[in-house]
């Protein structure tokens, strides 16, 4: 490739990064570049899958140890905002008890992010709903163990 083409591509990438950072803020931008906790857990203690009205699907996987979340991860087929929100939903659940997870909502995820475009705010609620589904799955399994 020519140096001119390489310079053009690099300049275009820099422009995209600057515009994305301006719209999403630094916290969401950094997580967009490096989404933490993305993946699947084999045999999770809790699993939640929710498809939003936008068509994005969010999956949350939880493993518990001594009553608290030991491992958490997410998978999505959605946009960058869904990826960012899924990453924060998984992160916020780590080390938490079921009662504490109940307090993780779309609003708390948005507060952590600082800002998200208005048209993408539903992604935080999609992530929180999937997290609550995973918690519900875990609680049902715990109840069955008691019987």
Task: Give the positions of each predicted feature.
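Short beta-strand elements
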Residues: 56-67
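Immediate flanking context of iron-sulfur cluster ligation sites
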Residues: 68-77, 111-114
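C-terminal binding/interaction regions
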Residues: 1-42, 47, 65, 96-147
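A short catalytic or substrate-binding loop motif that flags glycine-/basic-rich loops and adjacent residues
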Residues: 41, 51-55
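Short, thiol/selenol-centered motifs that function as redox-active sites or metal-ligating centers
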Residues: 54, 76-85, 123
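Flexible, glycine-rich terminal cap/loop adjacent to redox cofactors
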Residues: 88-98
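Short, solvent-exposed loop/turn elements at beta->coil junctions and helix N-caps
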Residues: 45-50, 75
